[in-house]
Each structure stands twice: as structure tokens, then as C-alpha cells.
Amino acid sequence: MTAEVNLAVELPGLKLKNPVMPASGTFAFGDLPENFNWDEMGAIVLKTATRHARTGNPQPQIDLLADGVMNAVGLTNPGAEVVASEKIPALREKHPDLPILASVGGESVEDYVEVAEILAAAKPDALELNLSCPNVSEGGITFGIVPEMVEKITRLVKEKVDLPVYVKLTPNVTSIVEIAQAAEGGGADGLTLINTLLVLHLDLKTRRPVLGNDFGGLYGQAVKPVAVRMVAQVKQATSLPIIGVGGINSPEDAAEFILAGASAVQIGSMSFYDKLAIKHVIDGLPAVLAGMGTSDVTSLVGQWQSNKQ
């Protein structure tokens, strides 16, 4: 019999019964499996909303690999107004005790602020800034790779909304620590990392990319070592709580992220293969933590030890 293990975690704006939640986009705006008790999750993270509705990128948008998923969906969503007026209220009515993180996207700094204000009016528990969107006014460069832009967007959003703000970091940078510190400087309440790795997969017969948008984002088991490394580095360099994401397929994977420095975790790609992946991680986590000699999940956060010490 597994010893009693406390999985409860408190983060800014979030009281989680356990540290496990879906990554943004996994279950859209609450489209969860019917054979799963939604309230067993620590929280739900919504798909990214933009100022106006988006139909997404050309097909194909998804490429399933042996050890991961490539996607170039293009932030398909009905627009922030619909998410705020319909999606969030409907989810709140069905699951009043389930913490909600609303994901914010944009094509300009002004977009991010406006979308954040629109979503905040629907009273989710927190916002997650998806800074992996392209900055249209600057030739399409990704917002999240420029420290000054990360700091600016975070600061402006924080000035306009009375909600905790978590900044989701792109791994496609030279220094993830520099980006994390920029978010902290802008007043972020927490960090989510990592977003997808920019990749290209070519079809040898057609000599063309497999994805309709050419380049895509890779997530799944293949990116886990990168994500764990970045979580560990950011934990050592900032004081912000971290939500870790990237290739979590099992309770052991979740525990590894927590050991590296994550206070909570998100699961994305595994849910494409197993709709109950989140439930399996939640159910299996107590035994894994007990086996590590831990009776409270919070006591494990960031407790890895370097071989160099």
C-alpha cells in the first residue's frame, strides 16, 4: 500500500489539488474526454486566444512521429471575445472548482494587452502569455526571443489586468535564462516552459515539407531532456514558480520535472495517443514520490543535486 502523499500545490492565483494539467491546446477550450472526471486535474489551460478568430495554417497541420508530435496548427481559435463570453463561462459553470488558465496570443504588443484585458474580464484564475507568436510589425520575428519585448509585454499586461500572469517561454533562444529574467523583470507571477522546438521534416519523395506551413513546432518525448535542462537552469536563475512542460509521458517524467524545479507540470502530446494520459500521471504520481521518500510533492521541487558538487 502506497504511503499517503500530499499532491496539493499553491501557486499565484492557483490552488491545485495536484500539480498536473493539460498544456495549452491539448483540450481546446474544454473539450475533455467524457470518460474522465475533469475535476481530477489540478487545472485546465485553454487554447491560445487571439484578438480575431483564426482558421489556422494550411493542411497538413499535424505530423505524428515515433517520439513526438510536430504541429503547425496556427492558433486556430474563435477569437478572444467568444472565448471570454462563451467558452470560459461555460467551463466555469460545469466545473466551478477547476482552476482555469486562459492563454493569450497576439500579432502586436497592443494585441497582447487587449486580448489579456478581454480574457481577464471573464475571470479565469490566471493568464498564460504565449510569446511564441510572430511580431507582424517587426517582420515576423517571434516575440519571445527578444528579452526587451518579453519584459515589455509582461509589464504592460500586468499593468492592465488584476490576475496572475504566467509567461510561456520559447526554447528557440540562445539563453533561456535571459528570457526568463526578462519576464521576471516585467512582473511575471510565474513561468511556463518550454514551448515547442522549431523544426522541419522533409518528404524525400516530394522534396517538400510534411507540414503545410513548412516549419512546425516539436513537442513530445523527444524534447524532454531539453525541457528538463531549461527548467533546472531557470529555477536556479529566478525566484518565480515554474510550470514544466515538454515530453511528459509518465508519473516518472512528471517527478523528474519537479525534481528539476517545476512546481507543476503540463501534459500535451501524450494526450494525442492516450486521452487519459493525464489521469494516469495523476494516479501514478503518489507511488513514484513515495518511492523517492517524499510525502509532500512541494518538498521535491528543485532538489536535484549536481555531480559536480
PLM-predicted stretches and their roles:
Residues 1-3, 218-239, 243, 249-309:
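Alpha/beta catalytic cores of nucleotide-metabolism and tRNA/nucleoside-modifying enzymes
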Residues 1-100, 106:
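N-terminal capping/small domains of soluble enzymes
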Residues 14-17, 94-100, 160-165, 236-240, ...:
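Short, surface-exposed connector motifs at secondary-structure boundaries
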Residues 20-24, 42-46, 100-104, 127-129, ...:
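Hydrophobic faces of well-ordered beta-strands that scaffold small-molecule active sites
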Residues 33-35, 57, 116, 204-205, ...:
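Short amphipathic alpha-helical segments
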Residues 51-55, 134-136, 198-201, 272-274:
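Short gly/pro/ser/thr-enriched loop/turn and capping motifs at secondary-structure boundaries
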Residues 92-95, 123, 161, 285-293:
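Structural signal for hydrophobic packing residues in well-ordered secondary-structure cores
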